[in-house]
Amino acid sequence: VLQLSFVNFKRGSYILIEGKSDTDRFYIIQSGQVQIAKQKEVVAEEEGNLLGPGDFLGVIACMAHHSQIETAVAVSDVVLIAVHYAQFPELIEKNTPIAMKIIYSFSRKMRYLDEALTRITLKRNIETDISHLFTIGEYYLRMSKFELALYAYYHYLKEKPNGQFAETARKRFMAIKSTGVKAPIEMLEPDTKQMVRVYHGESMIFCECQSGTELYIIQKGRVKISKIVDNSEVLLAVLREGDMFGEMALLENKPRSATAITAAEECQLLAVNRQNFNQMVTTQPQLIARLTTTLADRIWAMYKQLANTLIPVPIEKMYDMLSIQLEKMRIQPGAGKQHTFLFGPAELAKMCSIPKEQVAQAIAEFLMTPIVRSTDDSIIITDTLELSKQTAYFKKMQEIEQARKQSRANEPTYRGKPVW
């Protein structure tokens, strides 16, 4: 029998504190109300900041095994049900509706945060029009990545055979094929009955705006997740063995929000469709627990990325982003401890959404710092503890500056001048 404990908090009590690492459990509110807040709230919570019976507290930090992302205070006397991390697989088996409520709430939150990040960092709304597939094809054609262009043109034509750009897409598709570039049907339309899929390097798994009915688990190799914005490719993440992706389209039956392309090496994936997923909920609770952890990891990282958008100085943004990546990978900083990131300075600048006109100077400053070594496709930090300390120092200075601004804003004035 699943043994859950009840915890009481008096009105005004702190239940969670942002930044603390007490994340071995999460709570379900049984009675009462709880207010949540963040030090840097870039976007309002979709469900609001006042939680009540049936809502969850601390579930993202718990499932991601990362520090708390918010502070929670009891607005009234509250009774909470405590669920330990190790109990989650059993919760899936014994109380599937609660587990699925968490998964679907995570999926909705991810899409909401993804839309917010796109608006803030890329200065535009998420593309949902199928014609964006044609735009993606045009981009990869210009980049001479012909197989990727073929994939995008093919799926545009499949969805919009008589669309605005159909004739051009058809001509482009045939012209590329006439040069000898191969587009085997098993790559354009994988056999959905085959759960294990093997892709060669630089292959398209799915395209932004494409409809999707599967999530994927990487069994071997790496996958790059990106978007095409203003005729340039924005790298969102590099996923590795054991990682999952594509879950939002499966859970919400909505178009893909990003593009997935295999890295340079061969990649093997396990594809899970909706029917398999529904079976796995009851037969493989450990796998569903992993999916929940994956979603929690992504949401935690999105909140961190949103906070990163508020940092005004490019080099400080770059340090903060590297520290986020270390925490994502659960790498404990250490004096003289070296770490290699598998992306270069230009990709880091893209991840930080540094304006194009500032990128060259930001990279030059970044490379001048003593703990940084770099190649085109990797960054080596020679002392991760120093990186962590420098990031913390930058944050402290930002908080002090913010407090000064707030103080000046609150000063009494007489005809526009401070009263001393």
Model-assigned labels for residue ranges:
Residues Q33, V78-V79, R222, E266-Q268, ...:
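Structural motif
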